[in-house]
A protein has these predicted regions:
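Conserved redox-active cysteine motifs that mediate thiol-disulfide chemistry
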Residues: 47-64
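Short pre-active-site segment immediately N-terminal to redox-active cysteine/selenocysteine motifs
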Residues: 40-43, 48-51, 127
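Thiol/disulfide oxidoreductase modules built on the thioredoxin-like
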Residues: 102-104, 111-156
Length: 164
């Protein structure tokens, strides 16, 4: 019996790590850039919330983009769920559970900072969802306000990667 315990523990740890959402709490918009993979030539930011219907509808498309391009694209979600008053810990758990249910494994920020500061940093008026694509230097290349058009986003990313 004892020989099976380490194996079972290993299986549980692998299953948890493979399916677990990467949710990071952040208050300062200036630190968003630190959340990107330094190696990725394309960086994508998607601002969303669990209560936003078009945000939820586009999650599968974002997961597809993340899976399609792998390490060539650093995709970062920014959840605005904390902007609604309530129990912050419960809301953060809700976001984490939502990401797990949707099988989202790319990094997501649980944003707890000032919404105006975030809007200024990303140059948007607070209307979500919004998806912004940057090159490695941080120069904005493309943005889409509203529900993501997956084919347009993929075409833009392919163009940035040299047609790969």
């Amino acid at each position: 019996m004892r020989a099976y315990v380490p194996f079972a523990a290993f299986c549980l740890s692998v299953a948890t790590a493979a399916g677990a959402a990467n949710l990071v709490e952040l208050r300062e918009p200036a630190k968003i850039a630190d959340s990107f993979s330094a190696r990725a030539p394309v960086r994508v930011v998607n601002v969303w919330a669990t209560w936003c219907v078009p945000c939820v509808e586009e999650m599968n498309d974002l997961r597809t983009i993340s899976n399609t391009f792998g390490t060539q694209v650093s995709l970062l979600g920014i959840s605005l769920d904390d902007m609604i008053p309530g129990d912050r810990n419960a809301t953060k758990r809700k976001v984490s559970d939502f990401l797990d249910k949707k099988r989202i494994t790319y990094t997501n920020i649980y944003y707890r900072g000032n919404s105006d500061a975030l809007g200024d940093k990303l140059r948007f008026n607070g209307e979500i969802p919004i998806t912004i694509v940057y090159d490695r230097t941080g120069r904005e290349v493309w943005r889409q306000q509203g529900k993501l058009d997956r084919e347009k986003a993929i075409a833009q990313i392919r163009k940035m990667l040299g047609g790969k």
